[in-house]
């Protein structure tokens, strides 16, 4: 819905109806449009990240997935949501990004703490690593929405670190599962 709204808004501004991202970046969209498009993008991207409280699917997905699926999910796919915030929300919707920053920072901090405490309480190793991912991606989101270049660079580095280490952790967990069952 948000993508279609940008398509029509860009067409009304310039007469050129397009989905070309580089052309969409050039649009100076009204604040109320940015607000609604940001909200629609946020919902989809927050589920993909997963940011608290949209994280509930992740532990079950890791438990049910084979080892290779967990490695791909943790190592690559979770970062697609954070990348989408960097690629779409910040440059396309700058005013709405600033408006939503306090809300997202609060969710990120809650996710950091909540994910860490839930990870500590887990008996299943896959769930432990999954909840630690919720916590780590909270740090990434907090860095992205600190809205300065240094924090965004740190978030990108954390995404790479998380992809490598969590992927490796799921490989180790997979080896443990293979030997125990």
PLM ranges: what are they?
Residues 1-181:
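Hydrophobic transmembrane alpha-helices and their helix-loop junctions in integral membrane proteins
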